Amino acid sequence: MTPACFFLRCTIVLLAVLAVPCAHAQDTKSLARDIKNPFAKLPNLQVFYDANLNTGPQHQTQHVVNVRPVIPFDVGTDWSLITRSIFPVIAQPGTAPGSSWTTGPGDSMVAAFLSPAQAEHFVWGLGPVLQIPTASNDALGQGKWAGGPAAGAVWVGEQWTIGALVNNVWSFAGDHSRPAVNQLQFEPQITYNFVSNPDRYLTFAPTITANWKASGGERWTVPVTLGIGQLVKFGKQAANLQASAYYNVIKPSDASNWTLELTIQFLFPR
């Protein structure tokens, strides 16, 4: 089955779920707002599957599963520390005809944001981000320890959530034979929760990156994106389901042009 067919079938299942309102919607209204607030005091576990179409010189599909735990901690009564981590597993196509695939973990990322605990509609966070060279193969990571500042802000309304996260990392240790790292990641977000069903939403949330070490034409990746999601319950377990598509308007020559993404996010409200 091709990634596009797999994505289509999963999207049909998701749309069937979207047709059924979440039970006890009045109990989940705050959860529906919190799932798109990166600084909400909401422990959760996100699992993303990305099919990056037409990747590399052979124009094959790269498969990526990202596991992203989000764990908040109280720092006294006035502050929260929100930790956001990314642990990827990558299936990377070969670069030459007939060459084998490379599969394994990629480089991990860990960020920690200090954020006001009592903020309601406007929330911000500041902290460090660290890239850890956990990739099992050179093709799956950069081989460098890298770190830098991270920041974000978000406005949370009844129907709209608008905000952004940004970080830049510089390499400071690692494999000396690998190129130095200096890269930007910018994640704007606009999410609209439907009035008729606040547990259902549309979202625009591209991940824009810049590799400052690359030449001008290879530096930027700028996608446009649209996603649809629904807050659901499996028994007592609340979860968020989302399907998204990304098109890279600007990209390096070997990067994918389309990304199809499926997400399940398990929520553990305190």
Residue ranges and their predicted role:
Residues 1-11:
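Bacterial N-terminal signal peptides that target proteins for export
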Residues 5, 14-15, 98:
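Intrinsically disordered, low-complexity repeat segments enriched in small/polar residues
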Residues 9-19:
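Bacterial N-terminal signal peptides
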Residues 25-270:
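Transmembrane beta-barrel domains of Gram-negative outer membranes and organellar outer membranes
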